[in-house]
Amino acid sequence: MSSSGPLIHLSDVKKVFYTDEVETHALSGIHLDIKQGEYVSIAGPSGCGKSTLLSILGLLDTPTDGEYVLNNHSVENLSLSERARIRNREVGFIFQSFNLIGDLTVYENVELPLTYRGMSSSERKKRTTEALERVGMAHRAKHLPSQLSGGQQQRVAVARAVGGQPSILLADEPTGNLDSTNGEAVMELMRELHRGGATICMVTHDPRYAQHADRIVHLFDGLIVEEEAGSERREVHEQQLKEAGFGAIS
């Protein structure tokens, strides 16, 4: 696909859920561009539409109305199989609950999406090994998920997401099931991926993690109500810490 223009372009995207004749407006007119190599945080309270927006970006759901363009291609009229193909090649997912397959080893979990892409055995081995090395989990390749800590499982999930070299990484509360130490370790890994050129869109309700992005997009009741640079939020947070007698964040 062509890389000119924004990687992601949303114009007036709306999403309505219908249950028992009740309409729930999850998204009410989203306008959003994400550039190649950008790190964007989608922030807001529970129920504001963050995960719905991420599902649409990842082609797991379709908008009720509006336009979604990915890499200069409209996704509006794609068949289910076309959406699945693009999702497998263009998008890497990182979930809150890791979603690793329990009876597969670490290596097999990372390799599996590459198998679905029809890659040769040698190419799968190369990419899987590189992905595990990138997240510091190559030494655990033969272990099962049950033999890993939560932080280690999330690292494996990140390796699985980046192994296919996707155009964008979509992370849905990637620190939600982790303690603060492991959460910060995963966020540092995300920052390393971004410094390496990855395009990242992360959903989070935690301002400590949102502020590490290039740009923070605030959602409330299905609308973008504010955008700010992550650096601005970091400056505010550091000043608050200083006034409270603590050192600046790293």
Locate predicted features.
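Conserved beta-strand-loop-alpha-helix hinge in the C-terminal portion
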Residues: L223-G247
